[in-house]
Amino acid sequence: MRAAGFGAGLITALLDILKGAGAVWLAQAINPGSHWVHTFAPIFAILGHNYSIFLPDFDENRRFKGLRGGAGGAPTVGGAFGLWPTSLAIILPLGALVFFTTGYASVTTMSVALFAIIVFAIRAASGLPWIDVLYGVLAGILLVWALRPNIKNLLAGTERVVNISLHGWLKAKREAAKPKP
């Protein structure tokens, strides 16, 4: 959304959510009897999102450094949606609350995995598969790993804050109130 605008960002986010959900749906179609396969399919979608073969990274001497990609937040939400569609109605509003309160996209991204863990743990406590909790844990590990630079920025107080959030608004208000030299 930062680079291409709101519309392109929204379409990209929706397609990335479908990437995670589609992995589950494809696994369910190919192997309907194995919930383990359904649970691990979106993990591989997240890995493919974070380390895309279509985004190789090279140094200044054109030597291969690795694969680039996103952090995996949207495919994580999509994977949760694919495993249990109602999870979307829980995770998205909570993620929006985190985003519009903190103003940090990285914190929001990490929180969606935490929300998936909580949602699936509550479901598992009522007799549904515990393997879905493992999905949330593994997705969370992948998200935290991908967001290591952002975590460093958060700890240093240099992470970018979105102005449309409560935190961003308060920060802008404090800066505007500072006396000018």
Positions of predicted regions on the chain:
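Interhelical loop and helix-boundary elements at the membrane-water interface
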Residues: 1-21, 50-74, 100-111, 146-181
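Interfacial segments of multi-pass membrane proteins
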Residues: 1-5, 27-31, 70-102, 115-124
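Nucleotide and nucleotide-moiety/phosphate-recognizing core
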Residues: 8-14, 19-64, 82-86, 95-96, ...
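Loop-to-transmembrane alpha-helix initiation sites
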Residues: 89-90, 105-113, 127-139
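Membrane-cytosol interface at the C-terminal ends of transmembrane alpha helices
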Residues: 94-95, 140-142
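Glycine-rich phosphate/pyrophosphate-binding loop and the adjoining helix
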Residues: 125-134, 145-153
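C-terminal all-alpha effector/ligand-binding and dimerization domain
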Residues: 138-140, 169-170
